[in-house]
């Protein structure tokens, strides 16, 4: 069951991803509506992700300005700490730990704190485009869209909590 629902949800996520790239329809209103509905149902803040993903494509492989999956540099303190830790526990154990951490914590950490982003932007938050988080990723003209994304995800979370209260947490987790 989990494989079937995960595959279906991934398919919906891919359609929303295409909407975020502007590849779903020649009508912007349609692709933003479809993308917003699908991503929001999957607890992804559509417009926030649309913006950060565009920056990711514009700055891929840039060691300071990259938006996601920016490696720690050996010439910086956090990179030296990472290398020392990897050396201490071994390459295989470090790889297993890194993969586990990315799969369990990576997406929420990225959305809430800009984890894996480049150092030039500071900590960002896909739900809160203003202080105390860095606002470079979401210029003022994006704020209304970020707040719309936040509201949508909040509504879906509230519906899930209400469903869990009514039907039980197990029933909601089995969706």
Predicted regions and their residues:
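Active-site recognition of the HExxH zinc-binding catalytic motif
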Residues: 13-22, 53-57
């Amino acid at each position: 069951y989990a494989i079937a629902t995960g595959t279906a949800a991934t398919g919906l996520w891919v359609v929303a991803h295409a909407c975020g790239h502007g590849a779903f329809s020649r009508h912007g209103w349609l692709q933003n509506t479809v993308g917003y509905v699908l991503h929001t149902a999957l607890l992804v803040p559509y417009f926030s992700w649309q913006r950060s993903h565009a920056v990711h494509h514009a700055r891929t492989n840039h060691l300071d300005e990259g938006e996601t999956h920016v490696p720690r540099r050996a010439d910086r303190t956090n990179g030296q700490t990472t290398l020392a830790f990897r050396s201490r526990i071994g390459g295989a154990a470090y790889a297993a730990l890194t993969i586990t951490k990315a799969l369990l914590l990576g997406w929420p950490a990225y959305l809430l704190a800009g984890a894996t982003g480049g150092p030039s932007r500071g900590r960002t938050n896909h739900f809160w485009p203003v202080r105390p988080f860095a606002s470079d990723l979401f210029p003022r003209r994006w704020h209304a869209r970020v707040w719309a994304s936040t509201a949508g995800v909040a509504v879906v979370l509230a519906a899930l909590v209400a469903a869990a209260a009514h039907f039980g947490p197990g029933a909601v987790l089995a969706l």
